[in-house]
């Protein structure tokens, strides 16, 4: 009976514990289950010991022929209790196995959740990468389209460059730049302004440059001509010693502070300039300036010419800040001596505007160019080449400031004026090239399926307008059209500029042939006839008045900025 009561008590306790387990955590349930297993295992051992004791008692009673019914009943009860205990142990072990399985399942679930989170993050990252890649692809396609257009433009510029031979440069200089120069600096545009690849100054330019507006003294004329000849041939090893020997002789006979010494210093400065020795040339010009100020006075035109030449030289060395006050002083002298509306004042204003432009002083640049433009239009007329050149310079300044509309207006004015001068008043049947280029741009979509566009025959004849300024304007306006996305209009102007350059070079070749034939013919002329012919050539040269100073700084095909170094126009 004691065993039965013990089993009942254990079962009641077990039921109570199981009831409590429903409110326990998983760890507490596992801990309690382990405790129950230990208790059941102990109880099983106790029951087995009691059962073994009863079985031994039964054997003893049977030997004595006693009554074993009571003992057998107890033994049966104990066997049932042991079976129940074993069942409980099995259930507890199953619960432990289930608990372990649940723990493993929970761990797997947490692992899967972590993988899901990681996959979600990777998915979000991949979406971002896809969006970025699509954006980059779109930008790349846009860049490819832009590069293709730039490639076409560069191919055009390469075609233009093929015709920019040294022969063409020399002849263009003769046509547009052999004027009365103070120092006669040649065009640096074709070599990028690099002193190591400078070409010699033209003889006529050097001749005018040497004197700075003063007549060459008779005693220096022969030496002067020799130096010019050697320097123009690039034979500086002969020209420089000649100049130095002449300087030494002049200083011995006349002293250092003599106008003739200043003239020879100018000649030597020009030779040094052609060699790219800008520092030595500047020192000589400063010396010449001091002599002329002492001997001729601070407000003499020759002083203004030397100041201007020195400013040009500083500009070529990139010393724009040092060049500006020299240029301003030259402007003041020329205004005082020549008057505020003289063309040489306009030249000086152009120089000053360019120096300010290289320093980013665009308000002053616009003011100087506009005043120069007013002077040229008033004194020389709207068809003078200087008007178109100054408009180009002003347009270049507008471009550097991003004022594309104002620049476009000026370029169109230049082309319209050149067209009217060549072909008459503009009307529906006589349109300048820029109008026809814009018509092509507007009609591009209409003929995009391969249908041929109308043949604009009139713009082909406009190619005959072969002024260097007009050709430059065509290229600049074409570059502006490209910036605006008007590629058809840009290609039209570029083709026109290319044809114009080819036409101009053909004229140059024919002129050279004529000059050679004329030279042979002049041998048979009388001195009077030769003098008349030389006078015509000189007048043709003197009609031009600018020297290229540097390329446009922003990389576009803008107007090559001009820095004039001219002496006074005759009033």
Curated annotation (Swiss-Prot):
Compositionally biased region (Basic and acidic residues): 167-177, 526-544, 551-562
Highest taxon, organism lineage: Eukaryota
Annotated SMART domains: TPR
Region (Disordered): 167-210, 518-571
Main location: cytoplasm
InterPro entries (alphabetical): Kinesin_light, Kinesin_light_repeat, TPR-like_helical_dom_sf, TPR_rpt
Function: Kinesin is a microtubule-associated force-producing protein that may play a role in organelle transport. The light chain may function in coupling of cargo to the heavy chain or in the modulation of its ATPase activity.
Domain description: The light chain is composed of three structural domains: a large globular N-terminal domain which may be involved in binding to kinesin heavy chains, a central alpha-helical coiled-coil domain that mediates the light chain dimerization; and a small globular C-terminal which may play a role in regulating mechanochemical activity or attachment of kinesin to membrane-bound organelles.
Subunit and interaction comment: Oligomeric complex composed of two heavy chains and two light chains.
Protein name: Kinesin light chain
Organism of derivation: Doryteuthis pealeii (Longfin inshore squid)
């Amino acid at each position: 009976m004691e065993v039965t009561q013990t089993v009942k008590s254990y079962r009641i306790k077990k039921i109570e514990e199981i009831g409590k387990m429903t409110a326990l955590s998983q760890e507490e349930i596992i801990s309690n289950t382990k405790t129950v297993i230990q208790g059941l295992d102990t109880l099983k051992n106790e029951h087995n010991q009691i059962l073994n004791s009863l079985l031994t008692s039964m054997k003893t009673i049977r030997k004595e022929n006693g009554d074993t019914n009571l003992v057998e009943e107890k033994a049966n009860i104990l066997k049932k209790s042991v079976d129940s205990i074993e069942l409980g142990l099995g259930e507890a072990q199953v619960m432990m196995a289930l608990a372990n399985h649940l723990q493993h399942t929970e761990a797997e679930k947490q692992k899967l959740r972590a993988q899901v989170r990681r996959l979600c993050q990777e998915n979000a990252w991949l979406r971002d990468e896809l969006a970025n890649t699509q954006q980059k692809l779109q930008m790349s396609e846009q860049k490819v389209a832009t590069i293709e257009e730039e490639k076409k433009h560069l191919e055009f510029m390469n075609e233009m460059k093929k015709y920019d031979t040294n022969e063409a440069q020399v002849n263009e200089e003769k046509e547009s730049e052999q004027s009365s120069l103070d120092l006669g600096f040649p065009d640096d545009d074709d070599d990028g302004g690099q002193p190591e690849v400078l070409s010699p100054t033209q003889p006529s330019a050097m001749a005018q440059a040497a004197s700075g507006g003063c007549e060459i003294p008779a005693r220096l004329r022969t030496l002067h001509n020799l130096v010019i000849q050697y320097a123009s041939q690039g034979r500086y090893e002969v020209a420089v010693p000649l100049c130095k020997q002449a300087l030494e002789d002049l200083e011995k006979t006349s002293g250092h502070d003599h106008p003739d010494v200043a003239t020879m210093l100018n000649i030597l400065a020009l030779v040094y300039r052609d060699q790219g020795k800008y520092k030595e040339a500047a020192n000589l010009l400063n010396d010449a300036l001091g002599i002329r100020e002492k001997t001729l006075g601070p407000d003499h035109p020759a002083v203004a010419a030397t100041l201007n030449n020195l400013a040009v030289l500083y500009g070529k060395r990139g010393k724009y800040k040092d060049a500006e006050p020299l240029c301003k002083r030259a402007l003041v002298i020329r205004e005082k001596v020549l008057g505020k509306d003289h063309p040489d004042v306009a030249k000086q204003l152009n120089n000053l505007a360019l120096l300010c432009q290289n320093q980013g002083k665009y308000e002053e640049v616009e003011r100087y160019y506009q005043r120069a433009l007013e002077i040229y239009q008033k004194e020389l007329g709207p068809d003078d080449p200087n008007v178109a050149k100054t408009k180009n310079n002003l347009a270049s300044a507008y471009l550097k400031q991003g004022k594309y509309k104002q620049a476009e207006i000026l370029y169109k004015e230049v082309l319209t004026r050149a067209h009217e001068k060549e072909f008459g008043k503009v009307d529906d049947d006589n349109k300048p090239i820029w109008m026809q280029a814009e018509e092509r741009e507007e009609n591009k979509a209409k003929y995009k399926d391969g249908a041929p566009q109308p043949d604009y025959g009139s713009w082909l004849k406009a190619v005959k307008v072969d002024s260097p300024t007009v050709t430059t304007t065509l290229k600049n306006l074409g570059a502006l059209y490209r910036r605006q996305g008007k590629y058809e209009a840009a290609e039209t102007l570029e083709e026109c500029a290319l044809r114009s350059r080819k036409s101009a070079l053909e004229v140059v070749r024919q002129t050279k042939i004529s000059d050679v034939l004329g030279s042979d013919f002049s041998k048979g002329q009388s001195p009077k006839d030769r003098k008349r012919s030389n006078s015509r050539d000189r007048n043709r040269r003197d009609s031009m008045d600018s020297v290229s100073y540097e390329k446009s700084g922003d990389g576009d095909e803008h107007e090559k900025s001009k820095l004039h170094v001219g002496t006074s126009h005759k009033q």
